[in-house]
């Protein structure tokens, strides 16, 4: 917490990570193995690093100084910020303080303004993306698939978390979803979290936990089981159902998370580059 005359002017959440590169996005870009101890902004699962209430360079300088001292006290090898939006004031401020800014991933967004239904979203897509989403919905319906959106606290969060963990394990990050921590955290969010569930019969084949803020609808975590019958893919179904809910709630922006570039670009999302800004302690 940065204070000026006793008044809070900036705040920086940080996390101490043993194995600072769980997604493999830093090694090869920085001289590290990925197993080092690091003190980083937010957590890797947050794709929107920032310094809330950042007002001027003195605030950032003070925050960076405190971050460096805390990293030293904790025995960290590296400190800094990950998932910093390219072109943001934070990135400009960090590079001005001597941090290198290295591109590590892209985040994807969809502007929902002017859309009043999921069909209007489909209609705005290029032919390939439009046909894919409509075809998947039709085939899935014929194969007995249904989907629903409800408050996350009312859903079976252990079941959803298990599917998310199974999906993440294919990329080496299954440990991101420990059952008790995941279910407790999501349930504690109350109305800020919703669950999107896709089932074939009674079997959960795709699910997502989405977060709301005042203007955005975030596709925060998801899992998919591709062992289905009927010639469709569950992931496009989950995506369409999630966008449909975001539109129904009147959100201005759909946050589609990181990665899966080909699918997201095909289906109308725009990319925003994310950088890492790290220094050795």
Predicted regions and their residues:
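A conserved beta-strand-loop-helix scaffold within acyl/acetyltransferase catalytic domains
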Residues: 1-34, 78-231
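Acyl-donor binding region in acyl/amide transferases
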Residues: 19-102, 214-271
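Conserved catalytic-core motifs of GNAT/GCN5-like acyltransferases
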Residues: 102-110, 271-281
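Acidic/polar loop patches that form or flank catalytic/metal-binding clefts of enzymes
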Residues: 171-175, 193, 251-256, 272-276
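Short alpha-helix boundary/capping motifs
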Residues: 188-189, 267-275
């Amino acid at each position: 917490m940065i204070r000026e005359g006793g008044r809070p002017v900036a705040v920086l959440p940080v996390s101490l990570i043993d194995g600072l590169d769980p997604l493999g996005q830093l090694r090869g870009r920085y001289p590290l193995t990925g197993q080092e101890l690091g003190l980083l902004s937010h957590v890797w699962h947050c794709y929107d690093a920032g310094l809330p209430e950042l007002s001027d360079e003195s605030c950032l300088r003070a925050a960076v100084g405190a971050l460096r001292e805390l990293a030293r006290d904790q025995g960290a090898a590296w400190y800094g910020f990950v998932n910093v939006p390219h072109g943001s004031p934070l990135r400009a401020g960090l590079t001005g303080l001597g941090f290198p800014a290295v591109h590590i991933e892209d985040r994807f967004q969809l502007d929902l303004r002017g859309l009043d239904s999921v069909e209007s979203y489909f209609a705005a897509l290029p032919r390939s993306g439009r046909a894919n989403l409509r075809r998947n919905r039709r085939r899935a319906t014929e194969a007995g698939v249904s989907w629903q959106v409800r408050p996350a606290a009312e859903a079976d969060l252990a079941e959803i978390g298990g599917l998310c963990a199974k999906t993440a394990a294919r990329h080496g990050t299954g440990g991101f979803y420990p059952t008790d921590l995941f279910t407790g955290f999501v349930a504690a969010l109350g109305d800020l979290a919703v669950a999107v569930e896709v089932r074939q019969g009674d079997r959960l084949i795709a699910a997502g936990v989405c977060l709301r803020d005042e203007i955005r609808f975030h596709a925060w975590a998801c899992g998919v089981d591709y062992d289905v019958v009927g010639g469709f893919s569950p992931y496009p179904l989950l995506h369409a159902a999630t966008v449909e809910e975001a539109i129904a709630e009147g959100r201005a922006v759909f946050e589609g998370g990181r990665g899966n570039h080909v699918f997201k670009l095909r289906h109308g999302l725009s990319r925003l580059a994310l950088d890492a800004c790290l220094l050795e302690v």
